[in-house]
Amino acid sequence: MATILIIGASRGIGLAALRAALKAGHTVRALARSAAGIPVTDPNLEKFTGDALDPAAVRTALQGVDAVIQTLGVSPSPEMLFNSTRLFSDATRILVAAMQECGVKRLICLTGFGAGDSRNHGSFLFNSAFHLFLGRVYSDKDVQERIIQESGLDWVIARPVILTS
């Protein structure tokens, strides 16, 4: 079985991926800002407290890993309407460089429907609301996807539409 690093493993889809990987028999390394709060204990789970924007933390978590699942997210807030973010692109630049340095080739990244070439594939009403409320976040996800696509890694980008937990 593989050793998988999950970045953003403390909640939501990252936590679900962690549980699924353990259930499938994989060894999981979990990097999260609040790793102590990951509500899973398993002999095949190693938790790392660290930030996806910290190159040293990412390199440490990558040691001995066969593949990476990146599930970064931001909590909805009014600031999303007015402020841009670089979380996704900055963290991905750091991750890709560290993966190349450590010789890790496989990356699965979750962005979201509306990123990259899936932008503007909804109805007029959906697209208008989407750009108003999430446009700044998804502009950074566009950059994130380009970084991955140009990385030379063996990658998969998944774009879920709605995540409910």
Question: Could you tell me what each predicted segment is?
Answer:
Residues 5, 29, 156:
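Conserved beta-strand positions in the Rossmann-like core of class I SAM-dependent methyltransferases
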Residues 145-165:
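Conserved beta-loop-beta element that borders a ligand/cofactor-binding pocket
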Residues 72, 108-111, 161:
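Active-site beta-alpha turn of Rossmann-fold NAD(P)-dependent dehydrogenases/reductases
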Residues 36-94, 98-101:
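NAD(P)H-binding glycine-rich loop region in Rossmannoid oxidoreductase-like domains
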Residues 77, 113-119, 163-165:
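Conserved catalytic-site region of short-chain dehydrogenase/reductase
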Residues 4-24:
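N-terminal Rossmann NAD(P)H-binding glycine-rich loop of SDR-like oxidoreductase domains
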